[in-house]
């Protein structure tokens, strides 16, 4: 089922939580609402669910206006960050709960409930824990049971609010992979909220990046990472080094350094005499012992050679923050850079935002 949001506004007192949100969720797609705390992503999810109501605007489920309907009349499944399982019920009874409390005319038979619950427990790969209680499960297992319980009532839309936020890093990684595979089997429109960029990039078909109650960019994960459209998205999704300067005759000038901008690798056409900010990924910077076409100079302060890449930190007068460069082990072995060595930085690619774009 597709979902359409039209001109949505929401205030909490004087706080403007959502500002004219217009958005479409395609049928059977897994969409991430990504952004920092307070950006409005959870408020938007709760309004879609019917747990909150907008001040103005519309919510359409497959062209049906559900703006004023309660949560129980919208046919959505909701998974919270903190499981919300019934502690006095077994795993089986938790999953069966939504089916058992349906109105008598809609309630499946005991046999149908048993078949449905058994199938769902197999789907989440926890059928062997049917008779266990929540306090006997790990955090990851509890969240999978919470998801199975939401799916039991066959929701038209599945909504997940930071579903892995309470779990440790390794379990989160495992469940991300599991959720991605599971969604391909389910054929249900799913929306999940996260502040974790890796989670959004790894799991979703599409990402909606939000900031201060507004949508910054809507795109596929690859485009969000490699072709961010605003300075906020550029800095929020992935690591970047930031350099402030101005444009002069097709060059980015930072202090005494003038870097010739290559139109083939720069994301925007430079405009003369404009202030500009360059965002450069750590792997898009080259370290050199020569000043040719350099953007900055600095001193190496730290080298981390653990793993299959080498991370090098550099202090530079041309940047407000320490600069990070990522090299392959082979490139590092050839160059043999040392801590306290003075080097130059040459960008392979610039993501440039000029004053008129900011």
From Swiss-Prot:
Disulfide bond residue pairs? none
Xref: InterPro entries: AAA+_ATPase, ABC_SmlMolc_Importer, ABC_transporter-like_ATP-bd, ABC_transporter-like_CS, CysA_C, Mo/tungstate-bd_C_term_dom, P-loop_NTPase, Sulph_transpt1
Tell me the keywords, alphabetical order.
ATP-binding, Cell inner membrane, Cell membrane, Membrane, Nucleotide-binding, Sulfate transport, Translocase, Transport
GO MF assignments: ABC-type sulfate transporter activity; ABC-type thiosulfate transporter activity; ATP binding; ATP hydrolysis activity
Q: Where is the ABC transporter domain?
A: 3-237
Principal place of residence? membrane
Reaction equations catalysed? sulfate(out) + ATP + H2O = sulfate(in) + ADP + phosphate + H(+); thiosulfate(out) + ATP + H2O = thiosulfate(in) + ADP + phosphate + H(+)
Q: Which GO terms describe its cellular component?
A: ATP-binding cassette (ABC) transporter complex
Do you know which Pfam families this protein is assigned to? ABC_tran, CysA_C_terminal, TOBE_3
* EC class: translocase
Q: Which N-terminal residues, if any, form the signal peptide? A: none
- PROSITE patterns on file: ABC_TRANSPORTER_1, ABC_TRANSPORTER_2, CYSA
Instruction: Quote the subcellular location field of this record.
Output: Cell inner membrane
The EC number of this protein is 7.3.2.3
Q: How does it sit in the membrane?
A: Peripheral membrane protein
State the PANTHER family in the record.
SPERMIDINE/PUTRESCINE IMPORT ATP-BINDING PROTEIN POTA (PTHR42781), SPERMIDINE_PUTRESCINE IMPORT ATP-BINDING PROTEIN POTA (PTHR42781:SF4)
Q: What is the stated purpose of this protein?
A: Part of the ABC transporter complex CysAWTP involved in sulfate/thiosulfate import. Responsible for energy coupling to the transport system.
Membership in a protein family: Belongs to the ABC transporter superfamily. Sulfate/tungstate importer (TC 3.A.1.6) family.
Subunit structure, as described in the record: The complex is composed of two ATP-binding proteins (CysA), two transmembrane proteins (CysT and CysW) and a solute-binding protein (CysP).
Q: What is the protein's name according to its record?
A: Sulfate/thiosulfate import ATP-binding protein CysA
The record's gene field reads cysA
């Amino acid at each position: 089922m597709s979902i359409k949001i039209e001109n949505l506004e929401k205030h909490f007192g004087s706080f403007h939580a959502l500002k004219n949100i217009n958005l479409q969720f395609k049928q059977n797609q897994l969409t991430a609402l990504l952004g920092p705390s307070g950006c409005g992503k959870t408020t938007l999810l709760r309004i879609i669910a019917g747990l909150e109501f907008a001040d103005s605007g519309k919510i359409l489920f497959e062209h049906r206006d559900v703006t004023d309907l309660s949560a129980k009349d919208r046919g959505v499944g909701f998974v919270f960050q903190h499981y919300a399982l019934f502690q006095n019920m077994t795993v089986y009874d938790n999953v069966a709960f939504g089916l058992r409390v349906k109105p008598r005319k809609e309630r499946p038979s005991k046999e149908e409930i048993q078949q449905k619950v058994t199938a769902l427990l197999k789907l989440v790969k926890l059928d062997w824990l049917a008779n266990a209680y929540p306090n006997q499960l790990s955090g990851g297992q509890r969240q999978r049971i919470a998801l199975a319980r939401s799916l039991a009532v066959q929701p038209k839309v599945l909504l997940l609010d930071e579903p892995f936020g309470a779990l440790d890093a390794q379990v989160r990684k495992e469940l991300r992979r599991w959720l991605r595979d599971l969604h391909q089997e389910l054929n249900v429109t799913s929306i999940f909220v996260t502040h974790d960029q890796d989670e959004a990039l790894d799991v979703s078909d599409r990402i909606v990046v939000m900031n201060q109650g507004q949508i910054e960019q809507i795109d596929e994960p690859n485009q969000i990472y490699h072709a961010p459209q605003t300075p906020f998205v550029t800095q929020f999704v992935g690591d970047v080094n930031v350099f402030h300067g101005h444009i002069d005759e097709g060059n980015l000038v930072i202090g005494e350094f003038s870097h010739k901008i290559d139109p083939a690798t720069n994301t925007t056409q430079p405009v003369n005499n404009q202030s500009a900010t360059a965002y450069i990924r750590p792997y898009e910077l080259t370290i050199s012992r020569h000043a040719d076409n350099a953007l900055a100079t600095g001193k190496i302060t730290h080298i981390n050679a653990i793993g299959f890449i080498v991370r090098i930190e550099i202090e530079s007068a041309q940047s407000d923050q320490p600069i990070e460069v990522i090299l392959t082990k082979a490139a590092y072995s050839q160059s043999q850079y040392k801590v306290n060595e003075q080097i130059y930085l040459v960008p392979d690619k610039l993501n440039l935002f000029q004053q008129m774009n900011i």
